[in-house]
Regions:
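Catalytic active-site module of serine/aspartate enzymes centered on a nucleophile-bearing elbow/loop
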Residues: 281-302
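Mobile cap/lid helix-loop segments that gate and shape the active-site cleft of serine hydrolases
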Residues: 14, 30, 182-224, 230
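Short beta-strand element of the alpha/beta-hydrolase
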Residues: 48-60
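Primarily recognizes the serine-hydrolase "nucleophile elbow" in alpha/beta-hydrolase
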Residues: 113-187
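Conserved alpha/beta-hydrolase "acid-adjacent" motif
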Residues: 241-250
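N-terminal cap/lid segment of alpha/beta-hydrolase-fold proteins
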Residues: 13-48
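Catalytic nucleophile-loop/oxyanion-hole region of alpha/beta-hydrolase
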Residues: 69-73, 77-78, 84, 89-129, ...
Protein backbone atom coordinates (compact mmCIF):
# COMPACT_ATOMS: atom_id res chain seq x y z
CA UNK A 1 0.00 0.00 0.00
CA UNK A 2 2.87 2.40 0.66
CA UNK A 3 3.77 2.59 -3.01
CA UNK A 4 0.17 3.22 -4.01
CA UNK A 5 -0.21 6.02 -1.50
CA UNK A 6 3.08 7.70 -2.42
CA UNK A 7 2.32 7.76 -6.12
CA UNK A 8 -1.09 9.23 -5.49
CA UNK A 9 0.10 12.05 -3.25
CA UNK A 10 3.71 12.91 -4.01
CA UNK A 11 3.12 13.99 -7.60
CA UNK A 12 0.24 16.32 -6.80
CA UNK A 13 0.73 20.03 -7.18
CA UNK A 14 -1.21 23.22 -7.83
CA UNK A 15 -1.45 23.29 -11.63
CA UNK A 16 -0.84 26.19 -13.93
CA UNK A 17 -4.22 26.80 -15.54
CA UNK A 18 -5.02 29.17 -18.38
CA UNK A 19 -8.64 29.74 -17.39
CA UNK A 20 -10.24 30.88 -14.16
CA UNK A 21 -10.00 28.65 -11.09
CA UNK A 22 -12.42 28.48 -8.18
CA UNK A 23 -10.67 26.60 -5.39
CA UNK A 24 -11.76 25.21 -2.04
CA UNK A 25 -15.50 25.41 -2.64
CA UNK A 26 -17.27 23.79 0.35
CA UNK A 27 -19.90 21.38 -0.94
CA UNK A 28 -20.97 19.85 2.39
CA UNK A 29 -20.18 19.93 6.08
CA UNK A 30 -19.38 16.80 8.08
CA UNK A 31 -19.33 17.55 11.81
CA UNK A 32 -17.09 20.63 12.00
CA UNK A 33 -15.20 19.89 8.80
CA UNK A 34 -16.07 21.25 5.35
CA UNK A 35 -15.48 19.01 2.33
CA UNK A 36 -14.08 20.92 -0.62
CA UNK A 37 -13.87 20.84 -4.39
CA UNK A 38 -11.92 22.83 -6.98
CA UNK A 39 -13.36 24.04 -10.27
CA UNK A 40 -11.12 24.74 -13.25
CA UNK A 41 -12.98 26.75 -15.86
CA UNK A 42 -12.13 26.74 -19.56
CA UNK A 43 -10.43 29.77 -21.02
CA UNK A 44 -13.14 29.86 -23.66
CA UNK A 45 -16.70 28.65 -23.17
CA UNK A 46 -18.22 26.77 -26.10
CA UNK A 47 -21.80 27.06 -24.86
CA UNK A 48 -23.91 28.76 -22.19
CA UNK A 49 -23.90 25.51 -20.21
CA UNK A 50 -20.56 23.74 -20.20
CA UNK A 51 -20.03 19.98 -19.93
CA UNK A 52 -18.22 18.74 -16.83
CA UNK A 53 -15.50 16.22 -16.10
CA UNK A 54 -15.81 15.28 -12.42
CA UNK A 55 -12.55 13.82 -11.13
CA UNK A 56 -12.29 11.56 -8.07
CA UNK A 57 -8.73 10.91 -6.89
CA UNK A 58 -7.26 7.56 -5.91
CA UNK A 59 -5.25 6.60 -2.84
CA UNK A 60 -6.72 3.35 -1.54
CA UNK A 61 -9.69 5.21 0.05
CA UNK A 62 -7.18 6.21 2.75
CA UNK A 63 -4.91 8.82 1.14
CA UNK A 64 -4.79 11.48 -1.55
CA UNK A 65 -6.72 14.67 -2.12
CA UNK A 66 -8.13 16.88 -4.87
CA UNK A 67 -4.67 18.27 -5.67
CA UNK A 68 -3.91 15.10 -7.62
CA UNK A 69 -5.72 16.89 -10.44
CA UNK A 70 -2.41 18.69 -11.02
CA UNK A 71 -0.26 15.56 -11.31
CA UNK A 72 1.62 14.89 -14.53
CA UNK A 73 -0.55 11.81 -15.02
CA UNK A 74 -3.87 13.63 -14.81
CA UNK A 75 -3.41 17.25 -15.84
CA UNK A 76 -3.02 16.62 -19.60
CA UNK A 77 -6.46 14.97 -19.67
CA UNK A 78 -8.09 18.02 -18.14
CA UNK A 79 -6.24 20.50 -20.29
CA UNK A 80 -7.36 18.65 -23.41
CA UNK A 81 -10.96 18.73 -22.24
CA UNK A 82 -10.80 22.39 -21.23
CA UNK A 83 -9.79 23.19 -24.80
CA UNK A 84 -13.20 21.82 -25.78
CA UNK A 85 -15.05 23.90 -23.20
CA UNK A 86 -15.24 21.47 -20.29
CA UNK A 87 -15.43 22.67 -16.71
CA UNK A 88 -13.06 20.39 -14.78
CA UNK A 89 -13.91 19.58 -11.17
CA UNK A 90 -11.71 17.83 -8.61
CA UNK A 91 -13.36 16.69 -5.38
CA UNK A 92 -12.02 15.70 -1.97
CA UNK A 93 -13.81 13.23 0.27
CA UNK A 94 -13.41 11.67 3.69
CA UNK A 95 -10.68 9.06 3.96
CA UNK A 96 -10.68 5.67 5.70
CA UNK A 97 -8.01 6.38 8.27
CA UNK A 98 -7.58 4.39 11.45
CA UNK A 99 -9.58 5.65 14.39
CA UNK A 100 -11.71 8.10 12.40
CA UNK A 101 -14.70 5.83 11.81
CA UNK A 102 -14.84 6.48 8.07
CA UNK A 103 -15.86 3.61 5.80
CA UNK A 104 -15.80 3.22 2.03
CA UNK A 105 -19.53 3.90 2.02
CA UNK A 106 -18.81 7.39 3.35
CA UNK A 107 -16.46 7.98 0.42
CA UNK A 108 -19.24 7.06 -2.00
CA UNK A 109 -21.72 9.27 -0.17
CA UNK A 110 -19.37 12.25 -0.23
CA UNK A 111 -18.61 12.13 -3.94
CA UNK A 112 -22.32 11.62 -4.62
CA UNK A 113 -23.06 14.74 -2.59
CA UNK A 114 -20.43 16.60 -4.59
CA UNK A 115 -22.38 15.83 -7.76
CA UNK A 116 -25.62 16.90 -6.10
CA UNK A 117 -23.99 20.18 -5.11
CA UNK A 118 -22.96 20.83 -8.71
CA UNK A 119 -26.50 20.14 -9.91
CA UNK A 120 -27.87 22.49 -7.24
CA UNK A 121 -25.49 25.25 -8.34
CA UNK A 122 -25.41 24.54 -12.06
CA UNK A 123 -26.57 28.04 -12.95
CA UNK A 124 -23.91 29.69 -10.78
CA UNK A 125 -21.10 27.82 -12.53
CA UNK A 126 -22.78 27.75 -15.97
CA UNK A 127 -22.60 23.97 -16.25
CA UNK A 128 -24.89 21.42 -17.85
CA UNK A 129 -25.88 18.76 -15.27
CA UNK A 130 -27.00 16.49 -18.09
CA UNK A 131 -23.46 16.38 -19.50
CA UNK A 132 -21.33 15.27 -16.57
CA UNK A 133 -18.66 12.60 -17.10
CA UNK A 134 -17.25 11.03 -13.92
CA UNK A 135 -13.61 9.94 -13.92
CA UNK A 136 -11.36 8.35 -11.34
CA UNK A 137 -8.21 6.30 -10.90
CA UNK A 138 -7.71 3.27 -8.65
CA UNK A 139 -9.94 3.83 -5.60
CA UNK A 140 -11.29 6.81 -7.50
CA UNK A 141 -12.06 4.47 -10.38
CA UNK A 142 -14.27 2.37 -8.12
CA UNK A 143 -15.94 5.55 -6.87
CA UNK A 144 -16.51 6.74 -10.44
CA UNK A 145 -18.12 3.39 -11.25
CA UNK A 146 -20.37 3.74 -8.21
CA UNK A 147 -21.35 7.26 -9.26
CA UNK A 148 -22.35 5.98 -12.68
CA UNK A 149 -24.11 2.79 -11.60
CA UNK A 150 -25.86 3.52 -8.29
CA UNK A 151 -29.26 5.18 -8.62
CA UNK A 152 -29.26 8.99 -8.26
CA UNK A 153 -31.17 8.83 -4.99
CA UNK A 154 -28.89 6.22 -3.41
CA UNK A 155 -26.17 7.10 -0.88
CA UNK A 156 -27.81 10.30 0.30
CA UNK A 157 -25.66 12.13 2.83
CA UNK A 158 -26.25 15.83 3.43
CA UNK A 159 -30.00 16.31 4.08
CA UNK A 160 -29.90 19.66 2.28
CA UNK A 161 -28.69 17.94 -0.90
CA UNK A 162 -30.68 14.70 -0.71
CA UNK A 163 -33.59 15.98 -2.80
CA UNK A 164 -31.25 16.91 -5.66
CA UNK A 165 -30.64 14.01 -8.01
CA UNK A 166 -28.16 13.76 -10.86
CA UNK A 167 -27.14 10.93 -13.16
CA UNK A 168 -23.77 11.15 -14.94
CA UNK A 169 -23.93 10.74 -18.70
CA UNK A 170 -20.83 8.50 -18.69
CA UNK A 171 -17.93 7.26 -16.60
CA UNK A 172 -14.23 6.51 -17.00
CA UNK A 173 -12.30 4.23 -14.66
CA UNK A 174 -8.54 3.82 -14.66
CA UNK A 175 -7.62 0.53 -12.92
CA UNK A 176 -10.55 0.67 -10.50
CA UNK A 177 -11.78 -2.47 -8.69
CA UNK A 178 -15.22 -3.74 -9.61
CA UNK A 179 -16.03 -6.48 -7.09
CA UNK A 180 -14.91 -6.93 -3.48
CA UNK A 181 -16.89 -10.13 -2.93
CA UNK A 182 -14.56 -12.28 -5.02
CA UNK A 183 -11.13 -12.45 -3.39
CA UNK A 184 -9.78 -14.34 -6.39
CA UNK A 185 -10.02 -11.14 -8.45
CA UNK A 186 -7.30 -9.61 -6.26
CA UNK A 187 -4.96 -12.59 -6.46
CA UNK A 188 -1.96 -12.35 -8.73
CA UNK A 189 1.43 -13.96 -8.94
CA UNK A 190 2.90 -10.48 -9.35
CA UNK A 191 2.56 -9.50 -5.69
CA UNK A 192 2.59 -10.99 -2.19
CA UNK A 193 -0.04 -8.52 -0.98
CA UNK A 194 -2.96 -9.96 0.97
CA UNK A 195 -5.84 -10.34 -1.53
CA UNK A 196 -8.56 -9.15 0.87
CA UNK A 197 -6.55 -6.22 2.24
CA UNK A 198 -9.27 -3.66 1.43
CA UNK A 199 -12.00 -5.33 3.49
CA UNK A 200 -11.34 -3.18 6.54
CA UNK A 201 -12.07 -0.09 4.45
CA UNK A 202 -15.55 -1.50 3.91
CA UNK A 203 -16.40 -2.82 7.38
CA UNK A 204 -13.97 -0.99 9.66
CA UNK A 205 -12.58 -4.25 11.03
CA UNK A 206 -10.63 -7.26 9.81
CA UNK A 207 -13.74 -9.32 9.12
CA UNK A 208 -13.94 -10.51 5.54
CA UNK A 209 -16.74 -11.07 3.09
CA UNK A 210 -18.22 -13.96 5.06
CA UNK A 211 -18.84 -11.74 8.11
CA UNK A 212 -20.76 -9.03 6.23
CA UNK A 213 -21.47 -9.99 2.61
CA UNK A 214 -24.05 -7.25 2.07
CA UNK A 215 -21.51 -4.53 2.85
CA UNK A 216 -19.04 -6.00 0.35
CA UNK A 217 -21.72 -6.27 -2.32
CA UNK A 218 -22.87 -2.70 -1.69
CA UNK A 219 -19.39 -1.37 -2.45
CA UNK A 220 -18.97 -3.48 -5.59
CA UNK A 221 -19.95 -1.75 -8.86
CA UNK A 222 -20.44 -5.23 -10.32
CA UNK A 223 -23.66 -5.54 -8.31
CA UNK A 224 -24.99 -2.15 -9.42
CA UNK A 225 -24.53 -2.18 -13.19
CA UNK A 226 -27.73 -2.52 -15.23
CA UNK A 227 -28.56 -2.64 -18.91
CA UNK A 228 -29.45 1.05 -18.98
CA UNK A 229 -26.48 2.24 -16.88
CA UNK A 230 -24.45 5.15 -18.30
CA UNK A 231 -21.64 4.18 -20.69
CA UNK A 232 -18.32 3.32 -19.07
CA UNK A 233 -14.73 3.14 -20.30
CA UNK A 234 -12.40 0.83 -18.36
CA UNK A 235 -8.65 1.20 -18.85
CA UNK A 236 -6.49 -1.40 -17.15
CA UNK A 237 -2.86 -2.52 -17.20
CA UNK A 238 -2.12 -6.17 -17.91
CA UNK A 239 0.58 -6.28 -15.19
CA UNK A 240 -1.25 -4.41 -12.41
CA UNK A 241 -0.40 -6.07 -9.09
CA UNK A 242 -2.59 -3.71 -7.04
CA UNK A 243 -5.88 -3.96 -8.92
CA UNK A 244 -5.48 -6.90 -11.32
CA UNK A 245 -6.79 -6.92 -14.86
CA UNK A 246 -9.35 -9.52 -13.77
CA UNK A 247 -11.52 -6.74 -12.30
CA UNK A 248 -12.05 -5.02 -15.64
CA UNK A 249 -12.64 -8.33 -17.43
CA UNK A 250 -15.13 -9.38 -14.74
CA UNK A 251 -17.21 -6.21 -15.14
CA UNK A 252 -16.97 -6.25 -18.93
CA UNK A 253 -18.21 -9.84 -19.06
CA UNK A 254 -21.27 -8.96 -17.00
CA UNK A 255 -21.90 -5.90 -19.17
CA UNK A 256 -21.83 -8.12 -22.23
CA UNK A 257 -24.31 -10.55 -20.66
CA UNK A 258 -26.86 -7.88 -19.74
CA UNK A 259 -26.31 -5.56 -22.69
CA UNK A 260 -24.75 -2.65 -20.77
CA UNK A 261 -22.45 -0.19 -22.54
CA UNK A 262 -18.92 -0.87 -21.28
CA UNK A 263 -15.75 -0.44 -23.32
CA UNK A 264 -12.49 -1.93 -22.09
CA UNK A 265 -8.94 -1.16 -23.14
CA UNK A 266 -6.06 -3.30 -21.89
CA UNK A 267 -2.72 -1.49 -21.63
CA UNK A 268 0.15 -3.88 -22.29
CA UNK A 269 3.31 -3.79 -20.14
CA UNK A 270 1.58 -1.55 -17.60
CA UNK A 271 1.26 -1.80 -13.84
CA UNK A 272 -0.69 0.40 -11.46
CA UNK A 273 -0.56 4.10 -12.35
CA UNK A 274 0.67 2.97 -15.79
CA UNK A 275 4.08 2.07 -14.38
CA UNK A 276 6.33 0.34 -16.88
CA UNK A 277 6.26 -3.46 -16.48
CA UNK A 278 8.72 -5.31 -18.68
CA UNK A 279 8.45 -2.97 -21.62
CA UNK A 280 6.98 0.30 -22.77
CA UNK A 281 3.26 0.62 -21.95
CA UNK A 282 1.16 0.21 -25.07
CA UNK A 283 -0.69 2.44 -25.71
CA UNK A 284 1.66 5.01 -24.21
CA UNK A 285 0.67 7.28 -21.34
CA UNK A 286 0.09 10.28 -23.67
CA UNK A 287 -2.07 8.05 -25.84
CA UNK A 288 -4.02 6.87 -22.78
CA UNK A 289 -4.60 10.49 -21.81
CA UNK A 290 -5.82 11.30 -25.31
CA UNK A 291 -8.09 8.24 -25.42
CA UNK A 292 -9.57 9.30 -22.08
CA UNK A 293 -10.29 12.87 -23.12
CA UNK A 294 -11.66 11.84 -26.51
CA UNK A 295 -14.03 9.35 -24.89
CA UNK A 296 -15.37 12.04 -22.55
CA UNK A 297 -15.80 14.43 -25.45
CA UNK A 298 -17.79 11.87 -27.45
CA UNK A 299 -20.14 11.27 -24.54
CA UNK A 300 -21.21 14.91 -24.30
CA UNK A 301 -21.40 15.62 -28.03
CA UNK A 302 -24.84 15.91 -29.66
Amino acid sequence: MLTLICVNTCTAQTPKWDGQTVRDVPYKQVADRPLLMDLYLPEERRSDKSPVIYYVHGGGWAAGNKKKFGSTLMLPVFRQLAEHGFVCVSVSYRLCRKGQGVRMRDCVTDVKDGLRFLKRHAERYAIDPNRVVVFGDSAGGQLAQMLAYAAPEDFAGDPDLAATTIRPCAGISWYGPSDFTDVALFETGLSDRKPDRFGNRITGDEGGYQTNPKAFEEMSPYYWIQKDSPPMLLLQGDADATIPLAHAIHLKEKANRIGANVEMMIVKNAGHNWRRAGGAPTPSVPEIQRITSEYALRQVSP
